[in-house]
Amino acid sequence: MEIVDGSQRLRTIRDFMADKVTLRDLETIPAANNFRFSDLPNSRQLKFAETPIRVIILDNTTDAVTRTEMFARINTGGTTANDAEVRRGSLPGPFMNLIIELAKDPTFVALTPISPQLVDKREREELVTRFFAYLDSFDPTLNDGEGDIATYKEEPRRFYFSFVKERNDRIAAELDSGGISPTIDAMRTDFTSTLDFIKAVSPHGFTKSETGNQVPRVRFESIAVGSALALRVDPTVVDRVSDMTPLLSSNEFSDVTRSDAANVKSKLLNRIRLTRNWLLAQ
């Protein structure tokens, strides 16, 4: 059995109970500084030894998605890794490399002014992941032509994870067979053309104002994915639309980009379709 999370803490506890280490630099209980385990009263030693430790065992049959779910749940102390960080660590591959690359794209950075803290938490990688997951999973032929994301079951963590894994595998297979990946080329083109369009028609990029330093995910999804879908249907949207302000300042846009219950499928589809339909109607 291999300890994959918490190994250092468990070894420290073991060594303390074996009298191999001495307590140092304690702040909460400074009176215990310079104590070894054997220096504690017998009753305290017994209580320490009988304190339960929660252990979760994942066997070889546990799938990758479940592993990620479990790591997210057990990582409840200290600094918790968010979903983007967990995916980055557990899903290495060519698509993940593309996500990391595009998250640093100068145009994308300019259109998504966020705090250094959010940058450190991989927020831009989260936005790039959502862009591709929703865009490439959207089937415009479903739901009487309104389009749908059939694989989205209101479990966003599993949805994003499964999408990244599938794209990693697909792109790796393409690279292995021919040395090039049409999928990567198409995704990079979609991303770049969408950013160029948003830069031209949205005065404040993905923010709400000129001085804005926040990019609400629901706002980003509506603008980015909706625009990309419209460009796929009719590339001449680039020539016909010069300003998205009438849409972005409308009550309808405000309504569909509220953050409450944002992961509900109907709300996700409504905010994506609104931008797409508005652009195509111009």
Language model features with spans:
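C-terminal subdomains that position terminal phosphate/3'-OH groups for nucleotidyl transfer/ligation
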Residues: 134-282
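Basic- and aromatic-enriched surface patches that contact anionic nucleotides/nucleic acids
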Residues: 1-162, 238, 242, 246-247, ...
